[in-house]
Amino acid sequence: MVATCLQVVGFVTSFVGWIGVIVTTSTNDWVVTCGYTIPTCRKLDELGSKGLWADCVMATGLYHCKPLVDILPCRALMIAASVLGLPAILLLLTVLPCIRMGQEPGVAKYRRAQLAGVLLILLALCAIVATIWFPVCAHRETTIVSFGYSLYAGWIGAVLCLVGGCVILCCAGDAQAFGENRFYYTAGSSSPTHAKSAHV
């Protein structure tokens, strides 16, 4: 029962984390930047936001964005993390206690769960490296006022995927635990009904 609960917890945690990684990859609010000193930017109300895909500046009510081409490693890591999440989540779906694929043994589910756990940990490592590397590189080029919501979503998503992957790998039981979730039903023998016969 404990192993079953841990399998479900690992799946839910990993799924939420993967969504966070996708949100981080697709949005541009990684860091809030300033082209001048911070007091000057606040006075002029000219703050920018920088992400994987564009560098945007809001000045005098106008929003200007220019595409970025110089952060390809971070972009590649986040795309890899997002792509790795799909097979990992699909594999985890097939090992949930409520899903059974034919007459497969518990060891088959166990192997799929282990593979999903490894993919989730790789996903988390890619996201962690990218979300730490990006603000360090951005700080060298411009003044960073604060971190954006995308970066926080990336950190939280990466940690959740790391926790989910570790739970699946280490705590969700062995091959026997995956086999215990199978239930077999046999057709019961029906007792014959004896109706009273009326003799006239």
Swiss-Prot record:
Listed InterPro entries: Claudin, Claudin11, Claudin_CS, PMP22/EMP/MP20/Claudin
Topology feature Cytoplasmic, residues: 1, 97-115, 172-200
Record flagged with keyword Transmembrane helix: yes
Residues modified as Phosphoserine: 190-191
Major place of residence: other
GO cellular component terms listed in the entry, alphabetical order: bicellular tight junction; plasma membrane
Highest taxon above the source species: Eukaryota
Function (record text): Plays a major role in tight junction-specific obliteration of the intercellular space, through calcium-independent cell-adhesion activity.
Subunit structure as annotated in this protein's UniProt entry: Interacts with tetraspanin-3/TSPAN3. Interacts with OCLN.
Protein name: Claudin-11
Organism in which the protein naturally occurs: Pongo abelii
Protein's gene: CLDN11
